[in-house]
Amino acid sequence: MAAPVVPSELLDPLIEWLKIPSVSTDPQDPVPIKEAAEWVQEKITAAGGTADLVDAGGNPLVVGHFKANKPDAKTVLIYGHYDVQDPEPLGLWTTPPFEPTIRGDRLYARGASDDKGNFWPLLYAACEMAKAGELGINVRVLCEGEEERGSRNTNDWLAADNEPTDACIIYDSGRMGRAAAITIGGRGIITTRVTVRTGERDLHSGLFGGSVPNAIHELTRVLTHVLPGPDGILRDELRAGIIGAPAAERERWASAIPGEKLIELAGGTPLSSTSGDRYYEQNFWEPSLDVDEIRSGSPRTVIPCEATAFISVRLAPEQRNEDILSALKDVITSVLPGYASVRFDDDAGCDAASFDPEHPVLLAARRGFTRAIGEECQLMRIGGTLPLLDVLAKRGIPTVLTGFATLVDNIHGPDESYPLESITMGAAGGRALFEELAKL
């Protein structure tokens, strides 16, 4: 089968943008960060809009605006991010991460799916409609450079923003098969860095092995008290506040791709015999805890006096991030032996967010996507977290979280890619979405 054809005016700029190594995770280079932001700014102004690079305390925010072709039009905010994850390990890439390459029906590059390749078609649709005088809504553009670092500055900026906004569209999610999908909710999150210390300095294991505590040993013992059980379920203190999935959601799971298949497609291994059956409940309506990183020691046969773990907990709807972070710290502190100390750093978190699928904005989006893609638009949840959603929900802004990523895009990993057809689907869907929202 021939690869889908993407118009050059849609594909070529994306390839240009993907060549910019706008890595925001440490260590970051401010030059490509600014270059990627200026790329977005130039695209907006070239289409007749206005755009500024705003200093919100970190990497520049691109804040743009396209005026509607009629008075008293509604205002819609579109959001994306220009920053990307570190591409290491480079040796696992088939082609260099910042040399975009088409192989088969996919475009390979860091950021191809998350989020440059996903967001650009939406921005492209706004630019093209603005140039043709076809925008029946005011479009505000917010494109940030710190999403991969938690979006703290962006969240603060958006929470303080007082511009009237009737809806928000976010292209940073995925589709279901060939159908567009709208995400009506995601989980919350807490993160913290836990450091256990057992002495003043590292000591020689030949002189003190078995006589003094090893910080790695103590950290791992502590972690066993907060890790999930063999079925993936967390201890009661970390499950406080969960409400379970409503009947309507459970009915949707019956027609969804089986959990076992999703795990297989992603290249994972089921944790237990029930992981497939419980996939949707576990990832949408239950909390989960992961140790994402452990740092300590060296191969020098010394006993480390300090060990650090980075822990993340995905929160179920209705769980409060402050409560679960406090419970996590209480458990860790309570099981620590008297000869060790613990420190918590870099605490962060946000609550889960949900949006009413029957809101007029979401109904309009569903109509637009169904018309543009030719398949009935689906509703879904995600197990991930977009901190911006919490801010938007608290501001009462109905949000269409969508996009055209797929399960096999390998975001954040080597050989990240994006289907060529997703690029054209995203542009067509964006145009239809703007048209339907203009009718409200």
In which residue ranges do the predicted regions lie?
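A short core secondary-structure module
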Residues: 209-231
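Active-site metal-coordination/substrate-binding segment of hydrolases
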Residues: 73-143, 425
